[in-house]
Amino acid sequence: MGSGAAAGVCVQPADASAAERVRALSLFKGGFLRDPRTTPERHATSRLPPPGASGLPLPGRGGRADIQEEADPMTDRECVELLQWAAPRLRLRWEGFRRVRGQVCKRIGRRLKALGLPDAGAYRARLEAEPSEWDVLDALCRVTISRFYRDARVFEVLRHDLLPARLESLRSRGEATLRAWSAGCASGEEPYTLSVLFQLGLEPRFPGVRLALVASDADAGLLARAARGCYPRGALRELPRAWAERAFPGPGDEPCLAPEFRRAVDFLQQDLRSQMPDGPFHLVLCRNVAFTYFAPPLQREVLSRLVARLVPGGLLVIGGHESLPEGDFGLTRAAGPLPVFARTDV
Ligand SMILES: C[S@@+](CC[C@H](N)C(=O)[O-])C[C@H]1O[C@@H](n2cnc3c(N)ncnc32)[C@H](O)[C@@H]1O
């Protein structure tokens, strides 16, 4: 398990130069490894059509603020239409972006400006003409919101019930390692939460056990931030206070995670649609990525592959607002209404 067991680029969090290597790869390799947000943009002069020229309503255009943001080449509606058209081609579902589209639309707007394109229609034409632009759009569509201890009730049930039961059973078999995977780990908030929970919440009760944690994400820029391990205080607000004080001892607005909480985590750059670590895992966190943004057929494919990477009785955690696709995937609920499932079919 871990870096050796999986295809993809591995970053050890304590190794800043490795993080830089991932970043450099993302800039030079192209394809899914490309991170256009870190690519210098060509600044074009605005070639906006006059207001209303697109024939669509004008939300967000025409007011004073809009004069300041005159260079914004897309209305919200144009962006929505672009996403509705493009998402299926990326095996994504537009509905997942509905509530969080602001972040994505802003990025696409910046991309249009960088390319000197006047509107969403011109961007569609660019996509049709240049297949490599789809990789750029794909990367622009990644929603990056995360925080420590997100969905606190899930971490509480893991800490008090589900993981102690798993550790008891490991111990009874003479095993000492809990293997876990955070899929779509953003800047490390989720895997580091698990690392802190394990060390401060579980190790004192189960001395001698260890956590081996793989964390994967498609986005090299986020993985570089994860490797750095420093966060605005707002990202820590749900973490139990005593743990936050232990894990982030430094002063300032952007404290850094203490080294002992980083050691358990191996970061991998992988696209969940095509790559996964081998496993098997006792615990997989796949929250606010596949079951929000992926198209239903892809959700089913990914779910089958996730389940195949769980040990018998292994746990799958999804996001608080997500549900699993219909069908028998060999899972049962493991924590009442909370989005935690256990593998049953083995
Ligand atoms: C909304 S964040 C969720 C982060 C964390 N799991 C949580 O719930 O707080 C979604 C993450 O999934 C990543 N992501 C999106 N598409 C992906 C893909 N195809 N493969 C791997 N990671 C992906 C994004 O880069 C982003 O970091």
Language model segments and positions:
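A short glycine-rich, Lys/Arg-flanked "PGG" loop and its adjoining helix->strand segment in the class I
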Residues: 300-312
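Conserved SAM-binding loop of SAM-dependent methyltransferases across substrates and taxa
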Residues: 187-204
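Residue-level detector of structural "landmarks"
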Residues: 4-7, 11-15, 19
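Conserved beta-strand signature within the Rossmann-like core of class I S-adenosyl-L-methionine
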Residues: 313-320
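Conserved AdoMet
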Residues: 72-181
